[in-house]
Amino acid sequence: MDPNTVSSFQVDCFLWHVRKRVADQKLGDAPFLDRLRRDQKSLRGRGSTLGLNIETATRAGKQIVERILKEESDMPSAPASRYLTDMTIEEMSRDWFMLMPKQKVAGPLCIRMDQAIMDKSIILKANFSVIFDRLETLILLRAFTEEGAIVGEISPLPSLPGHTNEDVKNAIGVLIGGLEWNDNTVRVSKTLQRFAWRSSNENGRPPLTPKQKRKMARTIRSEV
């Protein structure tokens, strides 16, 4: 006898038993009860043909189903991404203006900054999603002065969807270099430090040498 035929019958017997319990608790409608009666007759006929006892087959079917359910529960669930926010909705949606606008496209990201800003303390904040403890998708990054003015921004290009963690790190480096060129002091939020800009110093980034600053600033020379 085909083992699959036997196991199929056993599982059908157990599932019928489950449906019978549902009916016993008055949870089945008329079509449900009608199918239950018809399937009972079918199982009796199959059991007679196969020479199998329905009660014994029901117990075996239960073991099969329980084993499958245990295997399902043991499977690791797919990791879910988390959305992290440094900025409020107001900070994300606020319009801002630049006296000396500069812009650079770095792969799938657009970097904008105001080159007129000098000698300011600036913090970078971002809203983004995280998966496997790494930045997954940048929604928006903005640079704020201590007074709350927006002086820089990194945003995904709608025409080039998709970017990597390295794309974001490179764009942050360009923005920091451009801002530091004008003697601004730039800090990175703790959230960004953890997921997108890991480094050794308290500001969340290794200090740039003057040569590196000049190189970073040159990369952002193209006008808006």
Swiss-Prot record:
It is found in: Host nucleus; Host cytoplasm. GO terms for molecular function: protein serine/threonine kinase inhibitor activity; RNA binding. One of its GO terms (cellular component) is host cell nucleus. Residues 1-73 are annotated as: RNA-binding and homodimerization. SUPFAM superfamilies: Ns1 effector domain-like, S15/NS1 RNA-binding domain. A motif (Nuclear localization signal) lies at residues 34-38. Residues 200-224 are annotated as: Disordered. Keywords: Eukaryotic host gene expression shutoff by virus, Host cytoplasm, Host gene expression shutoff by virus, Host mRNA suppression by virus, Host nucleus, Host-virus interaction, Inhibition of host innate immune response by virus, Inhibition of host interferon signaling pathway by virus, Inhibition of host PKR by virus, Inhibition of host pre-mRNA processing by virus, Inhibition of host RIG-I by virus, Inhibition of host RLR pathway by virus, Interferon antiviral system evasion, RNA-binding, Ubl conjugation, Viral immunoevasion. Its main location: host cell. The dsRNA-binding region is required for suppression of RNA silencing. Homodimer. Interacts with host TRIM25 (via coiled coil); this interaction specifically inhibits TRIM25 multimerization and TRIM25-mediated RIGI CARD ubiquitination. Interacts with human EIF2AK2/PKR, CPSF4, IVNS1ABP and PABPN1. This is Non-structural protein 1. It comes from Influenza A virus (strain A/USA:Iowa/1943 H1N1).
